[in-house]
Amino acid sequence: VNPQIPPGPPGRFFLGNLPEFARDILGYLTFCAREYGDVSHFRLGRYDAYLLNHPDLADEVLRTQRENFIKHRFFWRHVTAIFGTGLLTSEGDFWLRQRRLAAPAFHPDRIAAYGGTMVAYTDRLLDGWGDGETRNVHEDMMRVTMEIVSKTLFDADVESDVEELGRAFEMVLREIPVRVHRPIKIPDWIPTPGNLRYRRGVRRLEELVYRILAERRADPRDRGDLLSMLMAARDDDGNAMSDRQLRDELVTLFLAGHETTAIALSWTWYLLSHHPLVKDRLVKELFDQLGRRPATVADLPRLPFADAVVKEAIRLYPPAYVLGRQALSDCEIGGWAIPAGATVYLSPWVMHRDSRWF
């Protein structure tokens, strides 16, 4: 183990490299990987941080030594008002319990059953598109994924609420990166415009979720959606999820499920608009395999080029472009000593653009 600090950019006396990191996180991490190799060191204020830019090192953090690396508290404590203790934020035994409870809801057969819903809502979106029309496809993708997630998650058609929900999501999603990356953390109780927007967005989302939970408690029959599975799930002691636990999981799935998918689809549209030959080949495959009939889940194995297009878009523009983990105790990664309390960053954005792998 090399006891020295890995190479990295020099920083300011007090702030370290925080200004550059906060101003352009992807540009900064790309610079560190290019200039300093697979393991680089920088400081965020008084905290040590490391960028690991190799798939084997990511495997060390996320699998081999996963018990020594927790989800970054510095990040998650600023978003617990919205995510609570759902799968995205929880740790240890509680995370494992929640994961086991939720796992049956995500069985491939269960997910495949939602294919018809996805096609129906997509057709409804396309009915509103006109030839030659200019569209904000990101807004369209956010809307249709919100509708699909609402229907498949808790059998709710939110068309009447979608504009208000859209505003609530925008309030929350716009504020999350601001809360995480700003150098000076402002307490939630201070009524800044950002804090007020965030609280309004969280309150509106909670009102919707708790209203749905109350309706489902009053009529607990299985509706074939994910919420039915979550409500029916029992742990080894026979305990079900509480309303608060269900709320946390539903908000996590609602936010993460619709926003990340919408981002991936938006970048796919963007890339297709810049690569007409790829677009033409994709259209040909779709017409050859489907003609003009609606797609089904059974068609997916016969659409390899469509699969490749989406995966390439996600490679180039991964919705989860950086992950942070905190070391619980001193350890060794890639031959370098990582001290307890240090943060390690893994960036799919940077790794996916490394010519050694792609």
Regions found by a protein language model. Give the residues of each.
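Cytochrome P450 C-terminal heme-thiolate binding region
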Residues: 38, 45-58, 84, 203-218, ...
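Active-site catalytic microenvironments for nucleophilic, acid-base chemistry
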Residues: 151-156, 215, 268-275
